[in-house]
Amino acid sequence: MASLQDIQRRISSTKKTRQITSAMQMVSTAKLSQIQKYSAGYGSYAARLEAVVEHLVSAHLFDNADADHIPLIAQRPIKKTGILVVTSDRGLVGSYNANVIKQTNVLMQNLNLDTSNTTILAVGGNGADFYKKRGFEVILEHRGVSDVPTFNEIRSVVKTVTSLYENEVFDALHVVYNHFVNRLTSEYRDVQLLPLTGDTLNAMGGTEEQKAELNVQATYEIEPDTTAVLNVVLPQFAQSLVYEAVLDAKTAEHAASSTAMKGATDNAKDLIGRLELQFNRARQAAITTEITEITGGMAALE
C-alpha cells in the first residue's frame, strides 16, 4: 500500500497537471473564438468568388473553353495523384490527426494508390512525418501554421499547389482535412480539387431552383476571350479553396485541442478526488493503528 507521503506527492503532481490542462483549454477556446471571427470575414469573400465561378459555369463558359490552354481544367491520364494532407504540428488534440491519416489511408486503398503513384503535400508536421516514414514522396511540407493563418501566410503553399499541377507533377489533386462542425465535432473531408470541371463546380452549394435562376441571368460578353478570363479566375478560385481548407482545419484543430484539454482537466479532477479519498482512508488506518498500539502498551503496563 502506498504511503501517505507518496499519495500526497501524487495529489500535488496531479493538481499541477490540472492547472496546466485547464490553462491550455482556456487558451484553445480563445483561439477558437478568434479564428471563427476571422473565418466569417473571409467567408464573405469566398462566397462572392464562388458566386462568380457559378455564374461562369451557368453561362456555359466551360463548355466552350479551350482546355488545352487552361491548365486547371485540362484533364489528362492520371499517372500520379497528389494528396494535400492538412494536420497539426503538435499533439494534445485528441484523435484529430489520427482521424485524418486513417481516412486518408482508406482513400488511398479505394483509389489503388501507393508510394509509386502518389505524392504527398503536407500542411502540418504530423502528416509529413507519418508519410515520410512510410516511404511516400513529400514534395511540399509546410510547418508552423499560425493560430489564425492569413492568406499571405499560406500564399506560397496555395500557389505552389496550382503550379505543381500545371507543371504536371501530378495529374489529380485531393485535399483531405478535418472539417469543423461545432466545438465538439469535426468530420473528415476529401475534396478532389484538380482538375476543375464544369460538373464539379456545378455541384457546389445551392438548390436546383437557384442554379436555374443563375442560368437565366447568366448572359455575358467576355473580353478579351474565355481562355483569358478563366485563366485569371480559376487559379484564384482553386487557391481560395486550398486556403479555406487550411483555415477550416485549423478551426477544427483548436476545437479538438479545447475538447482534449477539457477531458484531461476533468480526468485530473476525478483522479484527485480518488487520491484524496485514498489518502484519508490511509491516514485513518494509520491513526487507528497508532491508537491500538497505544492502548495495547497501556494495557501491558497495567
From Swiss-Prot:
Molecular-function annotations in GO: ATP binding; proton-transporting ATP synthase activity, rotational mechanism
Gene source species: Leuconostoc mesenteroides subsp. mesenteroides (strain ATCC 8293 / DSM 20343 / BCRC 11652 / CCM 1803 / JCM 6124 / NCDO 523 / NBRC 100496 / NCIMB 8023 / NCTC 12954 / NRRL B-1118 / 37Y)
Subcellular location: Cell membrane
Protein name: ATP synthase gamma chain
Purpose of the protein: Produces ATP from ADP in the presence of a proton gradient across the membrane. The gamma chain is believed to be important in regulating ATPase activity and the flow of protons through the CF(0) complex.
Record-linked CDD domains: F1-ATPase_gamma
Keyword list, A-Z: ATP synthesis, Cell membrane, CF(1), Hydrogen ion transport, Ion transport, Membrane, Transport
Complex and partners: F-type ATPases have 2 components, CF(1) - the catalytic core - and CF(0) - the membrane proton channel. CF(1) has five subunits: alpha(3), beta(3), gamma(1), delta(1), epsilon(1). CF(0) has three main subunits: a, b and c.
InterPro entries noted in UniProt: ATP_synth_F1_ATPase_gsu, ATP_synth_F1_gsu
Entry-linked Gene3D superfamilies: 3.40.1380.10, ATP synthase, gamma subunit, helix hairpin domain
Main location class: membrane
